[in-house]
């Protein structure tokens, strides 16, 4: 009952938070949640809408930014969003705790061998040398209950720590994670691009552990839409998924323009982005934004094995026809 009550309160808050952006023409408008970083296809749609044949013509998007995937899950469950960026864990928590029914229609990024893996950093002079040394410390995470917390909890447990009792976990957005660490507000904090590259260039921090140590080939973020919205508006959602597909292709085909687009959205200098974006040391991206359902199933299975979720079948998230790539 405690979980359900928390979800009811959260869904009410999510609905109230973005009630002001309710669409005037629901049949032609999709309310979409987004976050940073690593949603290049959506950033292209936001910043270069004229590049898309349907966007702004046959349908519109009302964009709402969130700090992470968990609040967007709550907004989807509350009916306050139609589609949004999700992580496998946050989406699954919405199904279990919020009675959310949704389809995975596209995928944004995943961790590839040799590429970037989200990691936790400490100061160079910190006495923290191992995960076990985090006991009693204040640790920052982008969003509590978000996609990174699953493998994070697994790594803590493997080191003999209880994630609920042995550390103080606080929310620190990726954009301010470096400042929080350098100012001593946290003892360790998670790092994502481009903020990791910026911190590494300045020096004075070091990597403690990365998520790939717990779960290789993580599917970090995907695009999900409420099932009832998809079922009622199949042509509208198809147009949206076609543009997600097109956006991914544009992002990969024109790196120079993608650097400009991402810089505009993230407010990050192009020279910083140029050190990693769409290079071998970045996340992986499917060229057609196709969801890797087998990889997502493996993640759900691991979460079930560790007691974080009940057993779930990824098939419930797959629409028979509305899924990237769509032409």
Where are these regions (language model features)?
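Bacterial N-terminal signal peptides that target proteins for export
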Residues: 1-11
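Pocket-lining segment of extracytoplasmic ligand-binding domains
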Residues: 89, 98, 175-264
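Conserved C-terminal helix/tail region of periplasmic/extracytoplasmic solute-binding proteins
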Residues: 300-327
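Bacterial N-terminal signal peptides
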Residues: 9-19
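Short, glycine-/small- and polar/acidic-enriched structural segments
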Residues: 28-161, 168-171, 187-193, 217
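Secondary-structure end/capping motifs
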Residues: 231-308
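Sec/Tat signal peptide C-region and signal peptidase I cleavage site
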Residues: 21-26
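Soluble non-cytosolic domains of exported or imported proteins
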Residues: 66-70, 85, 142, 146-147, ...
